[in-house]
Amino acid sequence: MTAYDLKIEHGTVITMDGRRRILKDGAVAIKGDRIAAVDKTATLAGQPAARTIDATGRLVLPGLVSAHCHNVQALARGLGDDVPVELWTYGRIYPYETLLTEEDAYWSTLLNCAEMIRTGTTCHADPGGYVMDGVGRALTDCGIRGIFAWAGMDDFPKGYEPPADFPGRKTTEATLAANARLVKRWHKTANDRVRVSYGLRIEPNVSDELFQGVKAYADRDETLVQFHCLLLGLSEAVKQRVGMSTVQWMAGLGVLGPNWLLVHMSDTSDSDVVIVKTHDVKVAHNPGASMHSTYGAASKGKFPEMLERGVTVGLGCDSTAANNSLDMFRAMYQVATVHKEVRLQPDLIRPEKALEMATIDGARALGWEADIGSLEPGKRADVIVVDTRRTNWTPMHDFSIVANLVYAGEGADVETTIVDGRILMENRRLLTIDVDKVLTEGQRIAERIVRQLPYQETMRPRWPIA
């Protein structure tokens, strides 16, 4: 009779528990979908498992949590490079999303998830789109953990109008109904591995009534609201219209609370930070997207101040059309370096905080901290094994374990990815996704969409291709 289904032993275990313990020659034991024990390998040696993984020379840590990621935009990689955010949003991505089918969304999501699983992300928050049943199907099939939404909008002022046939262009009532249907269909399915939140697309396109509506619906259904907020290049439109920042506007409406996840938050004032902390609002920081698309998160944002005040800030990669990488190791490096460069303060965000943002703080941002984000008995078995027997990790000392992970680690170092006790990748081989088929279908669909896009003149190589 075996005590466990799976035991990972002889690794350096970064628990991310309340004491932030790191166990040399440690082990993680899994029974079903839960972590059963975390201890020294010698302590668990007399308790057999159905199978074991030898993690000698490897780190064992919680699966990474991406607090912001667009599944339906995986096939838009390359369509939004080097343009202002207004053009990116209304001129590039909205026309792309107008052409998507549910089947397109399914393959786009599998492509997205394959990249995440391969780089150690086990859970992600997707703020949504308009063909989200395809997303729900793909998350269910591939085994990753995620929460997604309908990207709500109901107000279309001059200069901030999506295409006439844009599928998100709905009334307040129709928007709320569309999101509520997704909640009813997908929320807490697949053993509570798939969840649905409410979503708001972008600040110029949201009315008072929609703010109040999503808050009421999210409270009723006990879920989150995801919202792109205070995004430099778009936040000015709200200031001109209502005479205050979007966060101040929302506070005045009485809608803010701990189930809000505000994304980007780059055009942020000190008073906005106080409001966010006062209402226990959660924040998703996407440094790679900000640097790629000049959102101003480091140059104008207040992320060090948020962290200083104790605001829960998760870390994300955004979409492959906005970053264009889903590697959370890369995101950890970015958040640990870009702010200290801008502020000229070398210890501003230490690697330990970057790892917290990618694990336990990300779980808190998504309302999932009771189940994931750390390796502790009783929590869901979302675990990754990282190979440190590589040139970019050597030498490594006890004092540099976390620093090496953040400053030198890469998603390609992830060897094994486990969600709910199920191995999704082992020895770098994906077990739940047919990668060759996903690549073929993804390329085929993307080429079809590109042929239909209205901005053909912008999609020409800058260098000659023979």
What is the predicted role of each segment?
Residues 1-26, 30-36, 41, 46, ...:
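Active-site microenvironment of metallo-dependent hydrolases
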Residues 11, 28, 33, 57, ...:
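Divalent metal-coordination and catalytic microenvironments
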Residues 75-107, 150-170, 232-257, 279-282, ...:
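Active-site gating loops and adjacent loop-to-helix segments of metal-dependent hydrolytic enzymes
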Residues 77-144, 175-191, 443-445, 451:
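Alpha-helical scaffold segments that flank or form the walls of functional sites
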Residues 137-273:
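Metal-coordinating catalytic core of metallo-dependent amide/deamination hydrolases
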Residues 233-246, 271-278, 294-306, 322-340, ...:
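Histidine/acidic-residue-rich catalytic or RNA/ligand-binding cores of hydrolases
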Residues 252-259, 304-395, 406-408:
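His/Asp/Glu-enriched, well-ordered alpha-helical/loop segment
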